[in-house]
């Protein structure tokens, strides 16, 4: 897993890596170019993103995106791809488009459970596995010179 974002988001990336507690999770926030980000996202099986530029990069590259909307709305800035799972609560107070919750509760994001995000990711993996062509196992031919 790779965590992407700006240099300002590096501490958040560090938190994600700490919670994941795996050497297979890398924080690349602030150390990649835009070209690097496009390459990394296009090679990914799935991208998890808030409503940001990276969400739309993932959509443009054809990578399945799990799009998390809080204070913004998928009605205004949807991922322009059929390969998207949108998580949005549509509360009475949203969309407010504020960077800080004006009501102080941040329910629009807090009510999207981590388990819901992970379920969406696992559904993508399961669909990819079902779509893979399965061939019968055969013994390998001996190598001949």
Which role does the model predict for each range below?
Residues 1-70:
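Donor-binding and catalytic core of enzymes assembling or modifying cell-surface/extracellular glycoconjugates
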Residues 61-89:
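Gly/Pro- and small hydrophobic-enriched strand-loop and loop-to-helix capping segments
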Residues 31, 59, 78-80, 95, ...:
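Non-catalytic, surface-exposed connector residues within folded enzymatic/regulatory domains
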Residues 8, 32, 72, 91-93, ...:
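Residue-level detector of flexible, active-site-proximal loop/helix-junction positions
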Residues 19-20, 41-44, 72, 100-103, ...:
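Alpha-helix boundary/capping residues
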Residues 82-145:
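Leloir-type glycosyltransferase catalytic cores
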């Amino acid at each position: 897993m790779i965590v992407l974002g700006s240099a300002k988001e590096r501490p958040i990336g560090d938190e994600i890596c700490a919670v994941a507690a795996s050497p297979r999770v890398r924080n690349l926030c602030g150390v990649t170019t835009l070209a690097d980000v496009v390459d990394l996202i296009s090679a990914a099986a799935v991208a998890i993103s808030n409503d940001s530029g990276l969400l739309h990069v993932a959509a443009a590259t054809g990578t399945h995106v799990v799009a998390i909307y809080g204070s913004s709305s998928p009605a205004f800035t949807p991922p322009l791809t059929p390969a998207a799972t949108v998580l949005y609560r549509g509360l009475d107070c949203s969309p407010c488009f504020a960077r800080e919750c004006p009501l102080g509760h941040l329910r629009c994001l807090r009510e999207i459970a981590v388990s819901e995000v992970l379920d969406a990711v696992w559904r993508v993996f399961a669909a990819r596995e079902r779509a893979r062509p399965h061939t019968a196992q055969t013994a390998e031919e001996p190598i001949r010179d």
